[in-house]
Amino acid sequence: ALMADKTFNLQIISPTRVLFDEAVDMVEMKTTEGEIGVLAGHIPLTTILEPGVLRIKTDGNVREAALHDGFVQIQKDKVTVLAESCEWPDEIDANRAEKAKERAERRLTSGSKEVDMVRAELALKKALIRIDLAGKH
């Protein structure tokens, strides 16, 4: 029964809106250091997030969101994710993501300046995350 109290407040905020603000059991995300799973009482930490899938677990339910760049601030009983952009699977337009993937691949094969390569690779990574997530739901 004690474990039941082990929730914490998770807030996911993007520049345009608050996507999520409720009590959760666990959140998993991808940081520059690798995947982390945060439970209640985690040590305070502020770290940069990589583009990836953010997984929220509450009462055995799992919700996933595609997160693109941002950072997370972990406090004793609260976790705040500030994301450049974050989308729920049902908001992801799979066709748009496919097109973005094609565009990114074209840019990668055209092989222009270095800077563009990095940007194109990132765009490709984002598109693939979106396609992956949209395909699962």
Predicted stretch roles:
Residues 1-3:
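Short, Lys/Arg-enriched N-terminal segments with co-localized hydrophobic residues
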Residues 87-137:
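Acidic/glycine-rich phosphate/pyrophosphate-binding loops and surrounding catalytic core
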Residues 9-103:
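Compact, glycine-rich, soluble single-domain proteins
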Residues 5-7:
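A general secondary-structure signal for short beta-strands and their flanking turns/coil
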